[in-house]
Amino acid sequence: MNEQDLLNSLRRDLNLPNLGKSHDGSEAVESTFPEKKESSLSAQQPHVDDQRSSLLSLLNAGLNASNQSPSNSGPKYYASHSSSTDALLQAFRDGAKPSGTASGADVKRSDSESTEATSNERPFNPVSAANLERLLMSSTGPQTPINGELKSNDSQDTAFQSSRNMPSDTSVASPDYSHSQSSSPIANYQESGNSEEPHKAEEQQQLSIYQLDNPGSGNYVWETVISPDKFETSTFAKCERNDIAIINRELDAQDNQLIHTNEDFIAYAVHREPIIRVIEISTGKSFLLHNNSPNKFVSVAWGNDSVIKNRLMAIDTTGQVLIFAVDIATSTSEIIFQLSGAQSLSDPIKSRFHWYPKSSTRFAVALSKHIIFFDLDLLNNISFPIPRSINAIQQLPCFLIDTGISAKEYDFSYDGTVFATVDKDALIKIYTVPTTFPSTPDKRPVPSEVSPIAIFTTRMERGPSKNYEKPINLRFISTPGTNNSRYLVIVYVMNQLITLFDLYSKRNIQTFRFNNRPTAATTTSFSQFSVDNERSTLLVGNPPSNSIYFFLFAKDETVSEQAPIYNSTYELILASLNTSEPVPADAKFSVIVAKKFEKAACISFTACKILESEDKYCIVVSNTDGYEYYSIPTSILDKTGKTVRSLESVQNYDADIGGTIDLTERHSTASPSTVNSGFSTPRSQATGFSKKKKDKGERFETKDKSSSVLSPSSYSASTFDAIPMDSIVSNILASLEKSVHKNYESLRSQLLEYKAANEKHTEAILSVVSSTLTENTGKILESVVEKSMQVALKEEIANSVRNALKNNLEKIESFLENSIAELQNSVREDFDKQTSSLAQLRYSIQNVAHAQKESEVKYNELNEQVKTLEGYVETVLEKFNDLKIENKVPETAPDVVPSSYPPAAESNVSVSSDTSTKDVEKQEPSSAEQPAQGIAESLRRLKEYVKAGSVKECVAEWCNMPSVAGFDVLSEISYDRMLENCSNLLLLTFIYHISLLDSVDDDRLSKRMEYISRICLNIDVNDPKVETVVHPVLTLTREALLRQSEFFSPIFKRRLVVLLRALDGKISEISVASSN
């Protein structure tokens, strides 16, 4: 059967007139064909009516209408779907969730955001539906169409909105994955890639490996200039790039480390939402962590303890720090630490968080110039959130360090013995890592008195070279085979300059400068900087060129022979300070591998261990299209035995070589920002760089100190309860003081009046006594009288004051007793109410949990019964079909599809004939129903074609005599082989017949829908051989599937929705092409 016969047969089945002239030049007879009578298929299934005649007019009317007035919204909506094969196939599989999986939240599409799916350059690796569920974690799509409209599943709560399919906000019940070859879904997805891709990728990426020739050391700095525009970079191969989540986002300077992994979990922040998704790598199970405020998260980090692996740190846009304890088994989490965010301008906004090395219990948080160290085991009885005030934090079990000036960043050494800070003046301060956390301020040193053990600087200018860039980040790194972190990598603004500082030789030994074209900042470079200490690899991103660079130490290089092997970084630094002789530094970066990200702008990245393989180097990346992970063969990063390009490095004798600053050094010309720390930087002198901007933390230092006493954030919860009582007592004491003073003045005035009234009588008595007694006796008597009067006056005054105080104190005592009694009663009543409410809530939760467990048990029992019944039904149907074929009963054979029409050559009816419709209907078919012998013969030929690999002949044979048994034989041919070997016309005929096939069991229905989706996505609508039939065939296929959907299971109804979208998109594409 040639293509012209195939086209005529298809047009005859569709009741379309044949064309007068075929596209290949052969003549074709124009004819019309009558409607066929209902076949056995229609007799057995009355709900699937063969309405070709009525459908034909409907299709023609719809096609004409679409050609005259094409819709503006339809083609635009489906254009993105039809342009990406992989995206539609992924969405098609998303509907096939395994039994027992909870449906996710309904996802709404934003009109303002891009609707384009993943790049069609991404690899399509077919995996099982279970693994796809675990890989993509996508929510369920819309339900079965009702009256031509797609209805969303309103029974589920919406977790968040996104322009892409987002993960569900409910815990996914883990299905049975025992059939999968690997326990890790991501490993399955990676291993299913094209085996030819890695070899090609390695050949291409070999061009982007550079070797630096910089032997020896001296009084100079090895300097390398990298021009990304001219630098040879290679893109990641398809087999190296895989999606974790697809989320459209815009660049935000606040975004930092948006995704992080450990050996067990993946965590990433959802764009514009206060949500973090946590995924278990081994099972693919995931659930959501919610912020207790409406602010999105900008940084996440797992603790790196080898035992406690479920603690996740998160920071939001206000600087709030949260630590979650994740329980993936129960899909629950607990906040075990919370430091509140900034509430005013006086509060430091930025929070810089670091876990202790190899710990999930101890960590440090930097707020402006303060660094606070905590231990979670000592914070069990602390109420959260913790205020963002240093005064409040000092009351907690912690350790504080005042760096004197706002440190840009800090980092722990890999062995955890020291940590380093770097500020805007390029000062590197080395401190010992605290191991004790006193509970009160009097048990710990004053934060400003904690001194560093060493201070280094990268700015010791020589000659005309003046480096005015401000450092923004630093990381420790060690050479392969050593236990200490000998080197510091300092990064300047936008990663334009990278300096390698040797702590042992106390100077800069190597610099890299990126020579980018002047462009606006595309994204923050703070997060595009990472160190993999286990592989001694530095990862640096270059935002203007959207590329990443791997810096590696040479494999054959070890620590300098002049430097003994120290067991810790602390010992190395002490030995460095005690060494006055110059020490050569010969261990430098010797290999650079340059890679480039495609399209989506990179935001952050970090090394990970998603793949448990020593042969692959993995990183996770967040970009403007979502989250991905990349795996690079370690053989590419190993330059041994390979020819790589050479990159020029020069010996710069005028570069900043750096050095050590004496801890006892003081400079009178130091700037105010450095006076607080007790040190002066080389730049702070008159000839140094100008200080045009004050540090942000210093600008509000005075205001913070003056307002901290009155600020609400400076009080704890217990202090707030004591404020009303303090005010009452102070008011009472003030009134008491006024009353005592008033009584004292009154008594004093009375005594003066009494003395004045009796003064005359006293003088008369004294004169008589003095005249009658001797002089001495009179003086003695006068003294006795005076003392008696003084005693009497003092006793009278004391009694008056005592009585006044007694009355006032009794009033105060009674008032306090009444107030305290009322307060106790009110607190007791509130406590009783809260206790009863909590008891009722606990009882309700227990009832709900019990009911949920019962419903789950019932659901599992019903599910097992349904599966058993389905197995019985399938067994009976198979036996029934086998019996029908063996008995050779043509009248009841359901395998014959009601699409067998007489061939075009046997019809003598033409378009120009005047034969009436009744005469056409009276014509008998040229051939009778096919006998069972014909079906058996067709099955024999199909098996021979399949065995011989004749794909085209096999499909043509089945289209000539379609049957269910023949479809089972035909389904052994893979989709890709069928698409490669069959023409568009043959494929179109094939999907027409399988859409009318009378079989709705799960296996055959799944294969039918897969064939239709594949052919729909790959058919060329511009092929002139099918341009007259492609629209009716696709429309008829769509209507046939809708009529049969009544007997579909819920799973296949969801898959049908996605398939109908693909058909509608292709039909809209045809309409747009015809209108143009």
Swiss-Prot record:
Is this entry keyworded Cytoplasm? Answer: yes
Where is it localised? Cytoplasm, P-body
Q: Which UniProt keywords apply?
A: Cytoplasm, Phosphoprotein, Repeat, WD repeat
Molecular function (Gene Ontology), one example: molecular adaptor activity
Q: Which residues carry this modification: Phosphothreonine?
A: 674
Q: Where is this region: Interaction with dcp2?
A: 789-1076
Task: Spans of WD repeats, please give.
Answer: 292-334, 402-441
Q: Which Pfam families match?
A: Beta-prop_EDC4L (PF24106), Pdc1_Ge1 (PF22063)
Principal place where this protein is found?
cytoplasm
* Cellular component annotations (GO), alphabetically ordered: cytoplasm; cytoplasmic stress granule; P-body
Spell out the InterPro entries in the cross-references: Beta-prop_EDC4L, EDC4-like, Pdc1_Ge1, WD40/YVTN_repeat-like_dom_sf, WD40_repeat_dom_sf
List where Polar residues composition bias occurs.
Answer: 70-82, 153-173, 185-195, 669-688
Q: What are the Basic and acidic residues biased-composition ranges?
A: 695-706
Q: Name one GO biological process term.
A: P-body assembly
Modification Phosphoserine, positions: 671, 673, 1075
Q: Which domain of life is it from?
A: Eukaryota
Q: Where is the composition biased (Low complexity)?
A: 1-19, 53-69, 174-184
Entry annotated with the keyword Repeat: yes
Region entry Disordered: which residue ranges?
1-82, 95-127, 139-204, 666-714, 892-934
Q: Which family does the UniProt entry place this protein in?
A: Belongs to the WD repeat EDC4 family.
Q: How does it assemble?
A: Interacts with dcp2; via C-terminus.
This chain's function reads: Involved in P-body formation. Acts as a functional homolog of human EDC4, which plays a role in mRNA decapping in the process of mRNA degradation. Enhances the decapping activity of dcp2. Together with edc3, acts as a scaffolding protein sufficient for the phase transition of the components of the 5' to 3' mRNA degradation machinery to form P-bodies. Intermolecular interactions between the edc3 Sm domain and at least 10 helical leucine-rich motifs in dcp2 and pdc1 build the core of the interaction network of this spontaneous clustering process.
What's this protein's name?
Enhancer of mRNA-decapping protein 4-like protein pdc1
Q: Which organism is it from?
A: Schizosaccharomyces pombe (strain 972 / ATCC 24843) (Fission yeast)
Query: What lineage is this protein's organism placed in?
Result: Eukaryota, Fungi, Dikarya, Ascomycota, Taphrinomycotina
